[in-house]
Each structure stands twice: as C-alpha cells, then as structure tokens.
Amino acid sequence: MLAQKQKLAPIGINQKIDYKDIDLLKLFITEQGKILPRRATGVTVQQQRQLAKAIKRARILSLLPFVASNEL
C-alpha cells in the first residue's frame, strides 16, 4: 500500500483569519482572483469557510479586487 502524504496546514489551528490581513488572504486566491479550493490549500472545512467569508468581505471593502486586471 502507498502511504498517504500528510499535508501541512498553511494556517495554524489557533491563527485568526481576518479580512484585514491581505497578505494571508492572497495566499488563498489565484492570479485571476478566484478563491482556491480546500483540496488545493490543505485547510480545514471551518478554515475554508472563514477564508471565503474574509476574502468576500475584503473584496466588498475594496481591499482585494473582484477580478484581476489584464495588464500586459
């Protein structure tokens, strides 16, 4: 049998997820501005929900863009 590879959580268990922490939130969005899925980031279900809510709040407050610009 193959051993399953253990994913390291990018966020600590007790780390606070806040909409004002833009550097942390940018780790969980693509270049186009889409929220990365949980299977790609390795976070828990609760953390994914908190991240999605924080990213959406940051977008509404114009801290993060809804879509990325197409600058060449």
UniProtKB/Swiss-Prot annotation:
Pfam family, one: Ribosomal_S18
GO molecular function, one term: small ribosomal subunit rRNA binding
Gene Ontology, cellular component aspect: chloroplast; mitochondrial small ribosomal subunit
NCBIfam families: S18
Keywords noted in UniProt: Chloroplast, Plastid, Ribonucleoprotein, Ribosomal protein, RNA-binding, rRNA-binding
Main location: plastid
Subcellular location: Plastid, Chloroplast
UniProt GO BP: translation
Cleavable signal peptide: none
Assembly notes: Part of the 30S ribosomal subunit.
The protein's name in its UniProt record: Small ribosomal subunit protein bS18c
Similarity comment: family membership: Belongs to the bacterial ribosomal protein bS18 family.
Domain of life: Eukaryota
Organism: Thalassiosira pseudonana (Marine diatom)
